[in-house]
């Protein structure tokens, strides 16, 4: 089935322009500004010796994450959740997703009793904020691990691989990769896929928004996501090599 060309002129299997800028902040152990087209997320990693109380004495480390959106990151200003006095369900969900995704490639024993906290703040949202956050957070995490190593806090290699994420969806019957907001809001099927650099799936979140999808469409979406995550993995490694 044919569909109207994408507004930004991309092919259906093409990522938006991706930029990964390291060392964005002076004080964080690792920091990255990641850009998926017009979506921009600042990912900062703080590293500290010690672990949460329930983890003490285990010899195991911990990695966790928090996600938030700046009030002016969308076209309509939203109040800060800290001012509201409670964290919304969507924010909790995405924070936990980022944490799970990063922990999938962590060797807790090699990390030792150290904690790495990732803070992912959306500066501008144009679809795919959670997948951009995961992709950028991995690079910040890798830099934080090197920071801990430079201070003598660890000697092993806690990273067992890399992790990246991308959105896919069906628009007018056609599977597409890396949806901006204008596509996301009218997608018949919307999916977020998290994968390791070795090609294994960490998480697949898929929802039929307008019409149910069949197995062939699911397979097509996963194939697109595999391609997208492989491209993102390459960009992550290029960023870390600079």
Swiss-Prot record:
Molecular-function annotations in GO: 3'-5'-RNA exonuclease activity; tRNA binding; tRNA nucleotidyltransferase activity
Top-level taxon: Bacteria
From the record, give the transmembrane residue ranges. none
Which InterPro entries does its entry note? ExoRNase_PH_dom1 (IPR001247), ExoRNase_PH_dom2 (IPR015847), ExoRNase_PH_dom2_sf (IPR036345), PNPase/RNase_PH_dom_sf (IPR027408), Ribosomal_Su5_D2-typ_SF (IPR020568), RNase_PH (IPR050080), RNase_PH_bac-type (IPR002381), RNase_PH_CS (IPR018336)
A biological process from GO: tRNA processing
> According to the UniProt entry, what is the EC number of this protein?
2.7.7.56
| Pfam families, sorted | RNase_PH, RNase_PH_C
Q: Answer yes or no on keyword Nucleotidyltransferase.
A: yes
Per its UniProt entry, what is the enzyme's top EC class, as one word?
transferase
Task: Give me the residues that bind phosphate, please.
Answer: 90, 128-130
User: What are the UniProt keywords, alphabetically?
Assistant: Nucleotidyltransferase, RNA-binding, rRNA processing, Transferase, tRNA processing, tRNA-binding
Under catalytic activity, the entry for this protein gives:
tRNA(n+1) + phosphate = tRNA(n) + a ribonucleoside 5'-diphosphate
The UniProt function text for this chain reads:
Phosphorolytic 3'-5' exoribonuclease that plays an important role in tRNA 3'-end maturation. Removes nucleotide residues following the 3'-CCA terminus of tRNAs; can also add nucleotides to the ends of RNA molecules by using nucleoside diphosphates as substrates, but this may not be physiologically important. Probably plays a role in initiation of 16S rRNA degradation (leading to ribosome degradation) during starvation.
- What does the subunit section of this Swiss-Prot or TrEMBL entry state? Homohexameric ring arranged as a trimer of dimers.
What family does this chain come from, according to its entry?
Belongs to the RNase PH family.
Protein name listed in UniProt: Ribonuclease PH
Give the gene symbol.
rph
């Amino acid at each position: 089935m044919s569909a109207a060309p994408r507004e930004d002129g991309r092919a259906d299997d093409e990522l938006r322009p991706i930029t990964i800028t390291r060392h964005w902040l002076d004080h964080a152990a690792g920091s990255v500004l990641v850009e998926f087209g017009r979506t921009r997320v600042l990912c900062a990693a703080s590293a500290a010796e010690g672990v949460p109380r329930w983890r003490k004495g285990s010899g195991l480390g911990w990695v966790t994450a928090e996600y938030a959106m700046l009030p002016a990151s969308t076209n309509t200003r939203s109040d800060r959740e800290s001012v509201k006095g409670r964290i919304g369900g969507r924010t909790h969900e995405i924070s936990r997703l980022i944490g799970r995704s990063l922990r999938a490639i962590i060797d807790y024993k090699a990390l030792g009793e150290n904690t790495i906290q990732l803070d992912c703040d959306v500066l501008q949202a144009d679809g795919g904020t959670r997948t951009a956050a995961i992709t950028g957070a991995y690079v910040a995490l890798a830099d934080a691990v090197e920071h801990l190593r430079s201070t003598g806090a660890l000697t092993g290699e806690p990273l067992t691989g890399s992790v990246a994420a991308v959105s896919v969806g069906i628009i007018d019957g056609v599977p597409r990769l890396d949806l901006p907001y204008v596509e996301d809001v009218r997608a018949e099927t919307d999916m977020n896929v998290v994968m390791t650099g070795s090609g294994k799936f960490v998480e697949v979140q898929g929802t039929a928004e307008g019409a149910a999808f069949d197995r062939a469409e699911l397979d097509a979406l996963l194939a697109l996501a595999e391609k997208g995550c492989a491209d993102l993995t390459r960009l992550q490694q290029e960023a870390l090599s600079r």
